[in-house]
């Protein structure tokens, strides 16, 4: 056994080093940055904190409780968990979270980053070893250049992508085996794993694979077509094997806001220089950017030199150079052409993470550079003279970059790049002068290459920053106690009045309304906006509730922290640790019967108070719930109104940004519960004062705001600071309304009379009873989804969407048992396809094995 281990270490020492060296480096960075357990920091930055970590918490709870994988009520009033799992959580490596406590989750995920990046280095080194045919230091250097490139460092917080980057080298080596040995098994399994772990990034890989195959060096036309059938067949088979994930994921993503096709109109983003400068040594990795032309391209200066060397040497055929160059040029153009970028991103906008497919370009460039390196190593000493062509080419490209760049170049990156080229050139000169033997020369440049990329990785992670877990999760214990005490079933919804993270309520696995994620249903986002909640392209937050919408959504409890200053209509319940619990004064339910007139509900009005009035009237036959309060024109500073529709909508132009560009004043003529709502995309910040005292500040637009029980004579001032940008103009629409408390009491009573009584809630199955006074519509505060099956007294009934967003069914007069079961759309069909796919691949493997045995017998 010991001898076997020694043999493995001897035979694969550099391949193993390509894994363990990045692990040591990244763990060293973790220690320096005080990442848990070496401190309280975490690598979970940007959306890894606000989205992915909460989703992991929900997943962890499901794994530990063996709850249904299909559905979760811990976000968005309920959501297709399988669809979200396929997008964010499907990697088998993530199952490690089931072995640890929730308090260790941030630590485990930080070190899972380390593992996944190291595995990217390892698989790349494996690919380069297969190309070189030897286990040597160069595979470590080029493997690390892939795993620690600026793309990986900058976008490492997208932990769900890493398996796709990890599988790419294995997929490409699988294509080599498929074409040269007619064996597609490795290709099929590697692509299957990639598709399973993240279908979205794998889509980009699949586009790249088509280009890779078309530009591959085939022996002849016949081989091109015969291997093409194998390539297409195994590609399709890998998709069929992953269908149990792909089908639900695809059907889920098609319900999102971003599923709407809208091709960009621009022709170009920027210039060659803007892009190529991102190759320079010392460039700061990009973690996110609103500008879609931004990119991470750095993968080593030696890479550029060896790529130039590849183009220069005679030992490589001209046609092969043209093929490789065409691929790189096309990818490079794709970075700068909005239409091509739109296609690469699955016909979706890039939403702050530009050029996500750049890892494909980086690996293609590294593969080309490594071919050049192999020629250098195999060739005679005079072959290395072609490096001067590469240096001249790099010099020309640097010059063009400096000339054409329209963004400010950091000259230190230019100097660092030139200095790195000079250092490598000294090594080449010493080799050409026969001062260095080839072994010393290749070892030295590979060592320098490793130092270069490692230093950039250290700098990159320092620039990325970290997150202090103590400041974000200090209330977790108290909120967990609140949840245990009050969250009895899915009907008991509770929310944080404001979260430190956008999806913090999901982190605590509260039955909440908030959902910020790429799988948020577009129709639900639109409906929440119409009802007065804050929404974004792929989010709707618990910001903008009224007594009516709280009852409608069965919101029973609110959780406050000491810094929360928002008013609430709920009554104080108790304090637990550092948080305070408030309870809804009204009884609520998950579903209510509504009058059929609700089908005429006008939910598309821009005024959310009108939308709620019409819903309350049409569904429950009550009088007007909100009465509009007239507001005077705003006081203006460095701003002028160019148009006024007479109903609170103002078109403006501003000349500067001031805290009081626009000031609206409301003087209360009586005691009342007052609410406001305003839209203003050009509003930078808002301050709300009551009788001269500040009560709220921050991003307050696009949501209903409760201003409390305002007394007669009180003065409310809403100060808006406008943005100082290229536009310097926009629209502000402000509406004020008072709640009719008598109508609200009547409405709450009728809702309770029409309430569905929940009797059982297990995983993806709910059941309860309803007593309908007549044939009515049964409304569930659950997002409409075709995966729901509803039965009334055991008979399946047709489901409909109210306002395109909420689940409803027709219920006849009388008392009935109503049950709901959820299975993600596409799961059953996907499972059948996956089973069929695995049967086919097993048969292929058995046939291949039999064929090999037959060949051995003939010999």
Where are these regions (language model features)?
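Membrane-embedded helix bundles of polyisoprenyl
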Residues: 22-26, 113, 117-131, 136-218, ...
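Hydrophobic alpha-helical membrane-insertion signals
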Residues: 7-79, 465-477, 481-506
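Active-site-proximal, structured, solvent-exposed surfaces of multi-pass membrane proteins
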Residues: 3, 8-9, 55, 633-859
